[in-house]
UniProtKB/Swiss-Prot annotation:
Interacts with TssB1 (via N-terminus). Interacts with ClpV1. InterPro entries: TagJ, TPR-like_helical_dom_sf. Pfam families: ImpE (PF07024), TPR_19 (PF14559). Disruption phenotype: Deletion has no detectable effect on the T6SS-mediated secretion of VgrG1a/c, Hcp1 or Tse3. This is Type VI secretion system accessory component TagJ. The T6SS protein TagJ/HsiE1 is unique to the H1-T6SS and absent from the H2- and H3-T6SSs. Component of the H1 type VI (H1-T6SS) secretion system that plays a role in the release of toxins targeting both eukaryotic and prokaryotic species. Forms a stable complex with TssB1. This complex, although not crucial for the H1-T6SS function, may fine-tune the assembly of the system. Plays a role in the interaction between ClpV1 and the TssC1/TssB1 sheath.
Amino acid sequence: MADPSFASGRLGSRLQGSIAMIAEELLRAGRLDDALKALQEQVRSQPSNATLRIFLFQLLAVMGQWARAQNQLKVVGELDASALPMVQTYSTAIDCEALRREVFAGRLTPVILGQPAEWIAPLLQALSLDAEGHGEAAQALREQAFDAAPAVPGRIGEAPFAWLADADTRLGPVLEVIVNGRYAWLPMSNLRSLKVEAPSDLRDLVWLPAELTLANGGATVALLPARYAETVEHGDDAARLGRKTEWLDSGLPVGQRLFVTDAGETALFDLRELDFEPTDA
């Protein structure tokens, strides 16, 4: 699995020579609370520095402090008009995190992208049953959905597979995406290809940009939630930074997203290109 130590990328190149480098070093060491304290001190000393506030927004997002991250984005937009496209993109991504939590709590239904699939309904019903404490019934519905979902072969890079699924059994053959500012589920049977690059900014550890080609030939850009939904609440700093994937006693995963196939496992940050073979459906 890729170990994305603090991937400052473009941001880091603008922080060279700044005391904010202390915060970056603390991030490399996986010390989120200490990094936040150091960065907040620097922002207080340079409140009109938009670059520092972008750094702060990203760090707060990694830590799941969504309201504070949203506030920093607002300030960035006021300080630097050229940053407004980024501000809009990630402001809606933060909003989608709230909706995402409601979906996994069984209280909301996500948008479904592409051709409707009947097997999606049991997956959503299972989330509601989980919330009501009916774990066995939820698992039965998931098994029903997995049996009905088509196994679509393809390749990860040059490595072939007969089927692919998310390691989170609540999702299985479904990909979580943020497209056009909306949180959605994309059945993998509706996906032709996915392309991503390695994380190059801290925010990529939360939402990884991707290029999607749908089975119907349409193409779009998206953000992929890079960490599992319970990561902020139940994961440690390494999980929040996407440096590992682990399972809680409840069976739920935290940390970096992981895909499983008949041939093995691939972490999201190790993935560059995923291609599914065309189907008759």
